[in-house]
Amino acid sequence: MVASRDTAWLLVGQVVAAHGLRGWLRVKCWSDFPERLTEPGPRWLQRDSDPEPLLHPLIEGQFFPAKGLYLVRLEGIPDRTAAEAWVGAKVLVPASQRLPLEPEEYHYSDLIGLAVYHQGRLLGHVSAIWAAGQDVLEIATPDKRQVLIPFVKALVPVVDLEKGELQVQPPPGLVESFLGQDRARN
C-alpha cells in the first residue's frame, strides 16, 4: 500500500543493515519513543528512490544492545534478499501519530537540521542525535567535521524551532578549534 501524497511523516528510524536470513532489519532509532520500533503496528518504509512511503506493518522488534540498534521484522520482507533492498530506507509513521511532549521536550525529527550557534557564530547543523543514556547532539560543521555536545539545558540553553536554530554554551575548549579559535600551544 502506497501512502497519500498529502500525509506528513515523522522519521522514527533508518535501516542500516539486514540481519540474519529471515528478513530482519537492523534499524537506528531516530525517535525518543523506542516503542515505535518494538510494538506491532503500521510502519512505512521509504528509500530515496521511492516517490512515496510503502506500508510494511511492524510484526515485532527488540533492542540489540551490543550494537545500539533495533532488530525489527516487517510484513512483506520475508528473507535476507528482500531485507537488503531496504538498507538505507527511512522508517516512518504519520505525523498525526506524534506523541505529546512535556514543555522543553522535543521530537528528534524537529532537532535534525537545526542551525547551531555558539556565541553568535554558526557552528554547524544538527546531523544526528545519539541516545546514549543522555541524548548527545552530533553537529556537522561546514568543514565536514563533527562536534558532539550533550543535549542538556546547561549546554544547550536555547532551542528555537520557529527560527530553526539552537544555541550552545559548551565548556571552554570543546568547540573553539571548530570555530578557528585554536590557541597557540607552548
Swiss-Prot record:
Q: Which GO terms describe its molecular function?
A: ribosome binding
The record's Gene Ontology cellular component field reads: cytoplasm; ribosome
- UniProt key word Cytoplasm: yes
Chief site of localization: cytoplasm
Please list the residue ranges annotated as the PRC barrel domain: 103-174
InterPro entries of this UniProt entry? PRC_barrel-like_sf (IPR011033), PRC_RimM (IPR056792), RimM (IPR011961), RimM_N (IPR002676), RimM_N_sf (IPR036976), Transl_B-barrel_sf (IPR009000)
> What Gene Ontology terms for biological process does this UniProt record contain?
ribosomal small subunit biogenesis; rRNA processing
| UniProt entry keywords in alphabetical sequence | Chaperone, Cytoplasm, Ribosome biogenesis, rRNA processing
**Compartments reported by the entry:** Cytoplasm
Disulphide-bridged cysteine pairs = none
Q: State whether it acts alone or in a complex, and with which partners, per the record.
A: Binds ribosomal protein uS19.
- Reproduce the free-text note on domains from the UniProt record: The PRC barrel domain binds ribosomal protein uS19.
**What role is this protein assigned?**
An accessory protein needed during the final step in the assembly of 30S ribosomal subunit, possibly for assembly of the head region. Essential for efficient processing of 16S rRNA. May be needed both before and after RbfA during the maturation of 16S rRNA. It has affinity for free ribosomal 30S subunits but not for 70S ribosomes.
Q: Which family does it belong to?
A: Belongs to the RimM family.
Q: Which HAMAP family match?
A: Ribosome_mat_RimM
Protein's UniProt name: Ribosome maturation factor RimM
